[in-house]
């Protein structure tokens, strides 16, 4: 069984095709940029991820076929806690708010009294890295986007 592993990173996406014993058959990488805005805001254009994914898939399938191999499964790993609001057609409504973005500091500070409860539920404290505060920020600061959001 050959598995194509897709890793969606902060500055690039990689696709590595492994054969059943773990040997690397092919490796592809596509680079993209984050946008660093005022006040420690960090965003990325979701279209960059989509374009990188299609490029890696196309190249990986072609190389596998050239080697007489096939792709039996795909596994995806991704940077955590980045948030993209999408509409009912799964189209992005804004850039992704990245995991290292700090725009939600004020939300997290206002919730410090909940740290013990949050920790008991999920093993983590209220922190701007995590996605919940980013969703709250969109609800509070970009209500026009939040109103159109089907999922994050």
Question: Predicted regions: what is each one?
Answer:
Residues 1-94, 120:
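N-terminal glycine/serine-rich phosphate-binding loop of ATP-dependent small-molecule kinases
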Residues 58-152:
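Glycine-rich phosphate-binding/catalytic subdomain of phosphoryl-transfer
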């Amino acid at each position: 069984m050959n598995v194509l592993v897709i890793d969606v990173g902060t500055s690039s996406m990689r696709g590595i095709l492994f054969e059943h014993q773990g040997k690397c058959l092919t490796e592809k990488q596509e680079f993209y940029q984050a946008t660093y805005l005022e006040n420690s805001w960090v965003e990325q254009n979701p279209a960059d991820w989509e374009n990188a994914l299609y490029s890696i898939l196309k190249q990986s399938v072609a190389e596998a076929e050239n080697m007489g191999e096939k792709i039996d499964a795909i596994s995806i790993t991704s940077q955590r806690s980045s948030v993209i609001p999408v509409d009912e057609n799964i189209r992005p409504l804004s850039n992704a708010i990245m995991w290292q973005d700090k725009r939600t500091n004020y939300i997290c500070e206002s919730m410090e009294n909940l740290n013990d409860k949050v920790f008991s539920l999920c093993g983590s404290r209220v922190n701007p890295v995590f996605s919940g505060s980013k969703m709250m920020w969109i609800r509070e600061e970009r209500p026009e986007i939040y109103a159109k959001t089907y999922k994050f």
